[in-house]
């Protein structure tokens, strides 16, 4: 399994879960040297491989994909994501440089990572690419909610991207799916200003997500 944004939050919980259950885990993040919890977890494990990869740096993505060329990756988890500065996502005060950054991380990045590692996924047994989405990207749920312009637009974009990716990769037997973690107690949720009581821990979220990932099949994606 390859997991992006694995240094904290949901990504780190994915690394914990999969490594504990005997998977070889390629844990990627922007700054491995600053990922203290991840480094400690690796030292106490034999199946975690930490790699530097910024999902907005296409050269880094291509280099890492080359390194693992011919190595089967059963599950690719596109987890890396950012919310972005909230006040700068209000109409009348929109920061379009920030828009580029949020789109680069949340929409362009997952698509590029999937494209770069698709050959490794194709030669695996499970052949799954899963990408984190959010209810904030839903027209039905959040269409009338006036905050988080860029985050919402980036999630809507990657939602369509993954649907199109699934159609594009079916001939290779690859499944591309969206998964939503729920209201998880992470730095991103804190940045959003959410004050609700229904938050769950990253570990709780991942326990449910890995079951969904395990049950995803070509039949369930029809």
Region spans (language model):
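N-terminal Rossmann NAD(P)H-binding glycine-rich loop of SDR-like oxidoreductase domains
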Residues: 7, 11-16
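Conserved glycine-rich Rossmann-like NAD(P)H-binding loop of the short-chain dehydrogenase/reductase
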Residues: 21-36
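The beta1-alpha1 cofactor-binding region of Rossmann-like NAD(H)/NADP(H)-dependent oxidoreductases
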Residues: 51-63
């Amino acid at each position: 399994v390859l997991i992006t944004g694995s240094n904290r939050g949901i990504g780190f919980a994915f690394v914990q879960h999969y490594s504990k259950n005997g998977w070889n885990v390629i844990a990627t993040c922007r700054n491995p040297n600053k990922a203290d919890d991840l480094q400690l977890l690796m030292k106490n494990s034999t199946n975690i491989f930490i790699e530097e990869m910024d999902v907005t740096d296409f050269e880094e993505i291509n280099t890492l994909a080359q390194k693992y060329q011919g190595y089967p990756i059963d599950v690719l988890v596109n987890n890396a994501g950012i919310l972005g500065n909230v006040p700068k996502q209000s109409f009348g005060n929109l920061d379009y440089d920030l828009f580029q950054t949020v789109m680069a991380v949340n929409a362009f990045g997952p698509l590029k990572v999937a494209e770069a590692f698709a050959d490794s996924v194709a030669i695996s047994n499970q052949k799954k690419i899963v990408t984190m989405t959010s209810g904030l990207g839903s027209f039905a749920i959040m269409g009338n909610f006036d905050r988080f312009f860029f985050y919402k637009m980036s999630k809507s974009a990657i939602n369509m991207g993954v649907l199109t990716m699934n159609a594009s990769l079916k001939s290779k037997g690859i499944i591309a799916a969206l998964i939503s973690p729920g209201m998880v107690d992470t730095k991103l949720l804190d940045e959003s200003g959410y004050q609700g009581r229904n938050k769950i821990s990253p570990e709780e979220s991942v326990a449910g997500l890995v079951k969904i990932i395990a049950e995803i099949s070509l039949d369930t994606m029809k």
